[in-house]
Amino acid sequence: MKVSGRNGWDDARMAIDVKIEQLWIPDSLDTPDAADFLAAVEVGRKVRMQTWGSDDLAYGPLEKLLEFADPYERQLILVAKVDGAIVGTVDIALPLTDHLDLAELTLDILPEYQRQGVGRRLLEAAEHLARGEGRTMILVDTNHPGASLHEFQQAQLVPGSGQG
């Protein structure tokens, strides 16, 4: 599938072939069928490294696998592949006991594939899936760095009283 820019223009820099598919969740991390799952988890780690300079906020493979046993949320992952390699993911959490109209999405795109329409394609596919599950509200989480504290010349985090 060809991805085009926002205004429908087709620029060679912005048009890449992207395949969106649901990720198979393995029973174990040490089987051959876990390769795509491990690659998807690695996308999240790389995005957090690029965004925060650390992978402290990234799920490890076992943590991610254990999420799928949560009795309160149905978890799904859609992946974006370019030339067979996973370049982006959208994790989809569908609450099962309350907020049944909600789908929570977490979007991660490898830095070298950002701003090329990959994220848009993943979000469109996730929205379609969520609507098919009867969800009418979507909450999207992405990782973006906040302003650096070094940018603040005046101690703006401290009230004028000096307390706090």
Which residues does each predicted region cover?
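Short, flexible/disordered intra-domain loops and linkers
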Residues: 29-32, 148-163
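A short helix-loop-beta-strand connector motif used in the catalytic cores of GNAT acetyltransferases and
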Residues: 64-79, 85-88
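Conserved catalytic-core motifs of GNAT/GCN5-like acyltransferases
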Residues: 94-97, 141-143, 158-164
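A short, internal acetyl-CoA/4′-phosphopantetheine-binding micro-motif in the GNAT/acyltransferase core
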Residues: 106-115, 144
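Conserved GNAT acetyl-CoA-binding A-motif
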Residues: 102, 130-152
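Short amphipathic alpha-helix that is part of the acyltransferase structural core
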Residues: 2-65
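Conserved acetyl-CoA-binding loop-helix of GNAT-fold acetyltransferases
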Residues: 115-128
